């Protein structure tokens, strides 16, 4: 009997790479009947890559609307689906997950972030209450998640916390897919640009990246959404090529122009043990990386010889790394080849999806 599955989210777009492209499509390709529910500016239903997608017309203008209006709409639609397994992706949906569990459904919580550590540096939460809010959020997350059928998360570090609460915790790392990156673009010795693709925020080190690219006099190709006027103004530097928010094909085109990819997140509780998907996308594209010198990242990057690690707060150090790879293109090419090999052999979604399918078949 084919199991009917409903994925739902309030915080992610309906075409989210992890949720739709990786998890939902992988499940559909393995015989599950998949429906994905999300909120957006327009209502539509379609079937894409064997996944039924339902976008609810619930524009999300602020967090309050997401927490209440969107959550209510998603829950109502999820009940209509009457699935065997429900799989949700946002902590504010934990109470809904437990309600579905009490209706006799199998329920999976997919924790994309280390929530309590993430809250501890959220700029929209006043500093004076961040610690108590983080403490309360951890207690609430623990209470609800421990009562569900399974927990999926993105890193071994987060798994350690959930292992204390639940016997069925699975790590599905957010690695890139070989199907999306079947081969690396041909390396051209005249690649003269570097790139950063992702959210453009201070905590992700974008200001230091902009300064370092200017100091090294190298063109920087950027794609992603910014969250402040200061960052928007800084994108007008002469050496910056800002592409805006782009589709997946454009991302790959940007990669093909560059000799290195930057992922220099600033130190933060939720960054130090993270596995940023852009790091693995650079690897998939055969790009050497310039990355933050966090212990786990440094260990992996040095083991596979796929790039350079820097202090992400030190503009001069980032600039020196950029110049080093720019002046040593053959070495950059070799590091990129090492990165691609590590991706194909170890760090790809096709390996991770096997754990996802095994979990589903066990429920």
Describe the role of every protein-language-model region.
Residues 7-21, 25-66, 76-77, 158-163, ...:
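N-terminal strand-loop element at the rim of the active site
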Residues 303-304, 308-315, 324-329:
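Conserved acidic donor-binding segment of nucleotide-sugar-dependent glycosyltransferases
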Residues 52-54, 134-183:
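Donor nucleotide-sugar binding/catalytic pocket of nucleotide-sugar-dependent glycosyltransferases
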Residues 25, 72-79, 99-102, 109, ...:
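Membrane-proximal helix-turn-helix segments that form the acceptor-binding/catalytic region
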Residues 221-224, 230-255:
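Nucleotide-activated donor-binding/catalytic signature segment of Leloir-type glycosyltransferases, i.e.
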Residues 317, 324, 331-346, 355-358:
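A short, well-ordered alpha-helix in the C-terminal region of glycosyltransferases
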Residues 256-272, 287:
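Acidic donor-binding loop of glycosyltransferase active sites
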Residues 5-6, 152, 187-214, 220-221:
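Conserved donor-binding/catalytic core segment of Leloir-type glycosyltransferases
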């Amino acid at each position: 009997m084919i199991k009917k599955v409903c994925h739902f989210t309030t915080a992610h777009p309906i075409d989210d790479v992890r949720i739709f492209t990786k998890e939902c499509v992988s499940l559909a390709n393995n015989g599950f009947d998949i429906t994905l529910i999300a909120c957006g500016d327009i209502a539509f239903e379609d079937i894409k890559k064997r996944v039924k997608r339902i976008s609810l017309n619930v524009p999300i203008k602020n967090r309050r609307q997401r927490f209440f209006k969107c959550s209510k709409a998603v829950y109502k639609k999820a009940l209509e689906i009457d699935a065997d397994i429900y799989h949700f992706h946002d902590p504010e949906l934990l109470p809904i997950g437990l309600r579905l569990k009490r209706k006799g459904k199998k329920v999976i919580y997919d924790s994309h972030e280390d929530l309590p550590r993430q809250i501890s540096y959220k700029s929209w939460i006043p500093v004076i209450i961040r610690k108590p809010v983080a403490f309360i959020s951890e207690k609430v997350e623990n209470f609800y998640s421990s009562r569900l059928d399974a927990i999926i998360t993105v890193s071994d570090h987060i798994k350690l916390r959930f292992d204390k609460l639940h016997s069925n915790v699975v790590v599905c790392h957010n690695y890139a897919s070989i199907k999306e990156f079947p081969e690396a673009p041909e390396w051209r010795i005249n690649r003269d640009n570097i790139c950063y693709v992702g959210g453009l925020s201070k905590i992700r080190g974008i200001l230091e990246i902009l300064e370092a690219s200017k100091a090294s006099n190298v063109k920087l190709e950027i794609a992603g959404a910014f969250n402040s006027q200061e960052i928007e103004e800084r994108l007008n530097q002469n050496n910056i090529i800002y592409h805006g928010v782009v589709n997946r094909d454009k991302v790959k085109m940007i990669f093909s122009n560059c000799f290195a990819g930057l992922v220099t997140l600033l130190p933060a509780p939720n960054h130090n043990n993270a596995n940023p998907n852009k790091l693995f996308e650079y690897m998939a594209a055969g790009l050497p990386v310039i990355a933050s010198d966090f212990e786990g990242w440094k260990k992996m990057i040095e083991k596979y010889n796929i790039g350079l690690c820097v202090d992400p707060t030190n503009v001069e150090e980032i600039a020196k790394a950029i110049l080093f790879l720019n002046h040593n293109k053959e070495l950059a090419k070799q590091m990129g080849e090492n990165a691609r090999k590590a991706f194909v052999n170890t760090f790809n979604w096709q390996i991770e999806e096997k754990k996802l399918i095994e979990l589903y078949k066990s429920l």
